[in-house]
UniProtKB/Swiss-Prot annotation:
Gene: Serpine2
CDD domains, alphabetized: serpinE2_GDN (cd19573)
Species assigned in the record: Rattus norvegicus (Rat)
Residues in coiled coil: none
Signal peptide: 1-19
Protein location: Secreted, Extracellular space
Protein name: Glia-derived nexin
GO cellular component: cytosol; extracellular region; extracellular space; neuromuscular junction; neuronal cell body; platelet alpha granule
Residues carrying sugar: N159
């Protein structure tokens, strides 16, 4: 089975209630936890939609902005991310190096770029620090021609995500007179399961979507040993979780869904945090079981502006208050858009023909089942650092 996880987050910069958390997380995990909190905000307005984000990508783009911020703008970013401007560089540089390491065996690429208006002068320390931390190059584009600028940026995105994401930026988001910078982060992931699914075990089964409607969708199936467990939310709602490691074993997929089919996925999501996911990793036990998982493709573009404002990052969006003096001292800048687009594809390796509906998981004496036939939560975790590369909910495969 192949998993392709290209991801892109874009911040366009133009002219002119923070939650509490136990201090039990490593610095590497703090950025991902911020992304999970953003995810929780998004889900509030999209409880029945497919949502895919990258917490690590959110941490990266906020880290890039933090390096250019000053005053209260920097303070808000530091408070929500929970490490200072010096810490952000050290931590994210360490995480990125670990994530793209060839030791992982799975393919992970992380790319960053700053696109600036022709003739726009970026402060040398900002450009140098971004290059050191994020391997980020500054590229000039002609924002006076929005269509041309979009083509250049979209081409970069398509190339860095191996063709999986294109047409992200549209000309109407570019102000030909005012747009000065576009910051971009792209993450691409491709992994093979440690325990692979066989195409002959795939058949259509019923999946009950978030809207209550039933759909017949192709379901992957296998009998193997998986680490799994169950726990309950503070208000007593039980849910189950399972780990599917990739063949390099440094990256895993975790799936969680309510134990009772009558419990909506939205009821357990507010309970999810980096600390929660860490507890799953520490309490799961290996069991031989039958796993049934839907094949699916999900594409989602999300505006992160309101979720970030809900967490307390507000000033960088306000023309009269934003302070990005470390990017440039010649003009006043503020963030006009912060967008994220992610695509996830789940497919069997090399399978192009019609699915063979061979049923082999019927025997009454078979091991316990873990059936994912209703809305579920998934995350892709880099285990050595605890970084969450991708996080999403699937309401309809």
């Amino acid at each position: 089975m192949n998993w392709h996880f290209p991801f892109f987050i874009l911040t366009t910069v133009t002219l002119s209630s923070v939650y509490s958390q136990l201090n039990s997380l490593s610095l590497e995990e703090l950025g991902s936890d911020t992304g999970i909190q953003v995810f929780n905000q998004i889900i509030k307005s999209q409880p029945h939609e497919n949502v895919v984000i990258s917490p690590h990508g959110i941490a990266s783009i906020l880290g890039m902005l933090q390096l250019g911020a000053d005053g209260r703008t920097k303070k808000q970013l530091s408070t929500v991310m929970r490490y200072n401007v010096n810490g952000v560089g050290k931590v994210l540089k360490k995480i990125n190096k670990a994530i793209v390491s060839k030791k992982n065996k799975d393919i992970v690429t992380v790319a960053n770029a700053v696109f600036v208006r022709n003739g726009f002068k970026v402060e040398v320390p900002f450009a140098a620090r971004n290059k050191e931390v994020f391997q980020c190059e500054v590229q000039s584009v002609n924002f006076q021609d929005p269509a041309s600028a979009c083509d250049a940026i979209n081409f970069w995105v398509k190339n860095e995500t191996r063709g999986m994401i294109d047409n992200l930026l549209s000309p109407n988001l570019i102000d030909s007179a005012l747009t000065k910078l576009v910051l971009v982060n792209a993450v691409y992931f491709k992994g093979l399961w440690k325990s692979r699914f066989q195409p002959e075990n795939t058949k259509k089964r019923t999946f009950v979507a978030g809207d209550g409607k039933s759909y017949q969708v192709p379901m992957l199936a296998q009998l193997s040993v998986f680490r799994s467990g169950s726990t309950k939310t503070p208000n007593g709602l039980w849910y189950n979780f399972i780990e599917l490691p990739y063949h390099g074993e440094s990256i895993s997929m975790l799936i969680a869904l309510p134990t009772e089919s009558s419990t909506p996925l939205s009821a357990i999501i507010p309970h999810i945090s980096t600390k929660t996911i860490n507890s799953w990793m520490n309490t799961m036990v290996p069991k031989r079981m039958q796993l049934v998982l839907p094949k699916f493709t999900a594409l989602a573009q999300t505006d992160l502006k309101e979720p970030l404002k809900a967490l307390g990052i507000t000033e960088m969006f306000e023309p009269s208050k934003a302070n990005f003096a470390k990017i440039t001292r010649s003009e006043s800048l503020h963030v006009s858009h912060i967008l994220q687009k992610a695509k996830i594809e789940v497919s069997e390796d090399g399978t192009k023909a019609a699915v063979v509906t061979t049923a082999i998981l019927i025997a009454r004496s078979s091991p316990p089942w873990f059936i994912v036939d209703r809305p579920f939560l998934f995350c892709i975790r880099h285990n050595p650092t605890g970084a969450i590369l991708f996080l999403g909910q699937v309401n309809k495969p």
